[in-house]
Amino acid sequence: MALKHFNPITPGQRQLVIVDRSELYKGKPVKSLTEGLSKKGGRNNTGRITVRFQGGGHKRSYRFIDFKRRKLDVVGTVERLEYDPNRTAFIALIRYTDGELAYILAPQRLAVGDQVVAGNSVDVKPGNAMPLSSMPVGTIIHNVELMPGKGGQIARSAGTYAQLVGRDQGMAILRLNSGEQRLVSGACFASVGAVSNPDHGNINDGKAGRSVWRGKRPHVRGVAMNPVDHPHGGGEGRTSGGRHPVTPWGKPTKGKKTRSNKATDKFIMRSRHQRKK
């Protein structure tokens, strides 16, 4: 879908660039596949702010998305493509031949009326799901499982994809968007194609209020605060903070490595931090 630009009849429209969603379904989602969603405002169960700069925003209902795709060898037809406020990708409503309805992540080049199916030996076409062991090497995929049966976790955001680049002793070798290459079990399911809405990265909100509509509040810099609020705060006039960047709690940030998950290091064949040759 194309991008929309606007004549600058207001200041907020001068820089505004949004995705044209005119081809998406304009009605309400399927009620049986939705659930109420309450605002947390960045608070946890004790009422303390655990994520700063969140709150407000337009009311949403949560759409249940089928990330597992374990309804095997049952053909489904794409009824419509829909907008989902809870994610950057578009979603597709699928009606299976037995009458069941489900939402899946819509890949690029999936259209209303197309048929999708999940199984161990199905065609390699956008929207179909199958184990990595059944896919030809070189396939572009999304919604990739890390553990068989857990549901897709990798490449679910708008425009993202992974590529199957090889196999090794029952494991599949994937190249991710970040440049990382990692091993995943060949029994893990993945869907064919790249995720829809690739223009998402080109949008420009045009005004601060558009972020507020999404539930994002102003992100205040530490150097603009008082010393009581942040290690970078205070000083006479504008300052640079006077120290290497730290969080409000004094921990180094902006480039400080924080990964300490040694349990999965053995699955990473090439780090995303290695220089791309």
Swiss-Prot record:
Record keyword Ribosomal protein present: yes
GO biological process, alphabetically ordered: cytoplasmic translation
GO (cellular component) term, any one: large ribosomal subunit
GO molecular function annotation: rRNA binding; structural constituent of ribosome; transferase activity
Heme among keywords: no
Record's subunit section: Part of the 50S ribosomal subunit. Forms a bridge to the 30S subunit in the 70S ribosome.
Record function comment: One of the primary rRNA binding proteins. Required for association of the 30S and 50S subunits to form the 70S ribosome, for tRNA binding and peptide bond formation. It has been suggested to have peptidyltransferase activity; this is somewhat controversial. Makes several contacts with the 16S rRNA in the 70S ribosome.
Protein name (record): Large ribosomal subunit protein uL2
The species this protein was found in: Brucella melitensis biotype 1 (strain ATCC 23456 / CCUG 17765 / NCTC 10094 / 16M)
